[in-house]
A protein has these predicted regions:
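Bacterial Sec-dependent N-terminal signal peptides
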Residues: 1-20
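Glycan-processing catalytic domains of CAZymes
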Residues: 15-236
Length: 236
């Protein structure tokens, strides 16, 4: 199912930019960040890992008239990534809870922005239609840096400007408290667990703007029990 907030009839975005993809508000979505990508899922929008997905896989999806979001972390350094050694120690902060080998980044630093620009260029060069930059709410976390809400807004808008400048759509991942300030800069929202935490109402501005909201719920019952899954879809 497509899990999204219902707030009445959506309206089309005003003057959509024809230079990058604009997923429709009712798009279907397949997310897979590990393992050999399945290319047989009947979804209009796929999401795969930026680093682990080949240009050949992306071309195969395009041949099936699929669109692709490429996932990467924009707010953390993951020690297993090919460019991990390019992040100076001065921009590496506290570890992410429950994610070994991953630390928060100082998003105010020009070197971090330079490296994220290169990741966006990689997405463009591989043929991704858009990107899903994760961990863009570090100002709310124990990052090891004195990040402010203004720092986060500036960084997230930087990511959106750079992505659009390269012809890429861009999703806002979580960062619920800044949605009203960022909805005009992003093409869709991707959220984790808004039903579990009763936070889905924060996402209404995207639906009102005619932009999709894609939701992930991690509770085992939604994967193992079809009735629970259907109930979740009905509530959404």
């Amino acid at each position: 199912c497509r899990v999204q907030v219902s707030v009445g009839a959506p309206v089309p975005p005003v003057d959509p930019d024809p230079d990058h993809h604009h997923p429709p508000v009712d798009t279907s979505w397949h997310l897979q960040l590990q393992g050999t990508p399945r290319l047989d899922v009947a979804a209009r929008l796929y999401e795969l890992d930026l680093f682990d997905t080949s240009s050949q896989t992306i071309a195969a999806l395009h041949a099936q008239q699929r669109r692709l979001l490429c996932y990467f972390s924009a707010g953390s350094q993951e020690e297993w990534r090919a460019d991990a050694g390019s992040f100076p120690s001065s921009v590496q902060g506290e570890p992410l809870a429950d994610w070994p080998g991953e630390v928060w980044l100082d998003i105010r630093d020009s070197k971090v922005r330079e490296l994220m620009r290169k990741r966006l260029q990689l997405a463009r060069d591989k043929g991704c239609d858009g990107v899903d930059p994760d961990n863009v709410d570090g100002y709310l976390q124990n990052s090891g840096f004195a990040l402010s809400a203004a720092d986060q807004l500036d960084y997230n808008r930087f990511l959106a400007r750079e992505a659009h400048g390269m012809g890429l759509a861009i999703a806002l991942k979580n960062d619920l408290q800044q949605i009203t300030s960022l909805v005009d800069s992003f093409d869709l929202a991707i959220n984790e667990q808004c039903h579990a935490f009763q936070e889905c109402h924060y996402l209404a501005p995207f639906i009102q703007a005619g932009k999709p909201v894609l939701n992930i719920e991690y509770a085992d019952r939604f994967m193992a029990d079809e009735q629970s899954q259907q109930q979740l879809c009905d509530e959404a």
